[in-house]
């Protein structure tokens, strides 16, 4: 989630990213969050298929952005991505080079926008295809380690 968030934020010129996780949550209508990071990368050559599996955008969907205050970001981190409006939110991971300040507004690359959030803010289609962003981002590395998740 950290690498995907950094990739999506940098590709869209966003200040930070909120990436929802595709964890199983009892009581939700489907077994999976289709707007979240769904897998891990392992020590091996990474293929386009590997990227399509982990990316919330799959093969061809674009990255969404929103403008949020630090307080809204904090609230979303506490509640998660409530995909079904039932209060059972998929957790968000914050990927940011700085700790968001409560009163400041940030452009956020976001993976998982609930109906409530969409009603409260403007969701923008960045026009950047997630797979294209991932190929450019991951293609810059010959190897990837946990240290590469750092964004400063």
Where are these regions (language model features)?
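Catalytic centers of hydrolytic enzymes
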Residues: 1-152
